[in-house]
């Protein structure tokens, strides 16, 4: 399925499949405004009905324990109330606002609230055939369409699992859109190896996503790396040695000293993100660092991991080869799921087994090696091999493993004729014999992936070589995010 929405709206798409991953981030803040008839005497007669459905909505949402609710203090029936209540929710910092319709209401009230509140907006009509709530919602929706305010629509009893999931899907998507605004991406280096797909227009980023771009020279990594205390490096190397499956020093491209240099690079890059308050980064690496200092594979792995050699930490999105649209895609996935995100290439399609082979040139977060919050469970499946000297003269370790099996959502922001769109690809990582790793680049991390589409459709339609993945099914949320920010999308699925 595909969408071509710019200012037009699509109904909220709801998944009824059991989600394997759960939202683990801090509770999303959902604002709720309820609308009534603009005639005072009619409004007063409808207060009990409105309050009944509002109470049912609030109690049902509270039971999920996923949301912090900010409910308007009054049921809205005047323009003054609409403006004041919307502004109050905006000041409270809601991640999105639900417009609640149980009875007939004057539709201009919703427009006034939307003009003065904080979107994205979800219009909900409760299941109440005795009152024209659905009519009110559709009238309000039509008015919002006319003034160009994007919104989603949902109808039914909130006790219905589909409706409840629709509300949760909406607010999680809305929170991504709002939390992305005001963030800063650090571009460490510049465009890598002539890839247009990695370079961006800062004006376009700010206009569409609300994200700023801060440039940092790769020299910062090298200078800071040499200042990291030796004892810290030794402890980190010991920590890795005790936990990974193997560090293969059999080839000249990987030595203990080169491992230490990679560890230094990691700490230096982490220090840069903290000092400059960067929310996510892209590191060029190739060819300057990979030829003359050391590959940044270890940095990308452990920045994206929810832990490192010093313990648990927040995952910091890091895009390989300074792929900025890739890093932005990853940040969207991270904000949506609060989980590590993969960065890799579409390397090969196995026609005999109907498997796509996704691989990175040396680095992926180690979380995907075991899909565990315990680093030991993941790292026991990880081997550090020497990088390919043909491409990487400075050497260093690759972070090699096979992705643990499970349902995944793959995504990629791309541009066509300057216009952004998102590729959304539901899939599944599967386990195969370890010997299969040798069919491509055995020293690199790989994910063997089942997709429900024809290989030619994906290869002809995808907007670049890099894609990004998280465990779980988040197709509907990504579709909603695209609608909220006004970009096109295409879901590559045979279903």
Predicted feature descriptions by range:
Residues 11-24:
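Short, Lys/Arg-enriched N-terminal segments with co-localized hydrophobic residues
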Residues 23-138, 145-146, 155-174, 195, ...:
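Metallocofactor- and cofactor-centric catalytic cores in central/energy metabolism, strongly enriched
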Residues 32, 172-204, 208, 354-372:
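Conserved anion/nucleotide-ligand pocket segment
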Residues 124-148, 314-332:
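Ser/Thr/Gly-rich flexible loops in soluble cytosolic domains mediating phosphotransfer, phosphorylation
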Residues 152-157, 343:
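FMN-binding flavodoxin-like domain, especially the glycine-rich phosphate-binding loop
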Residues 243-336:
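Long, internal scaffold/assembly segments composed of regular secondary structure
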Residues 307-432:
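C-terminal catalytic subdomain
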Residues 383-495:
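Extended hydrophobic packing segments that form well-structured cores
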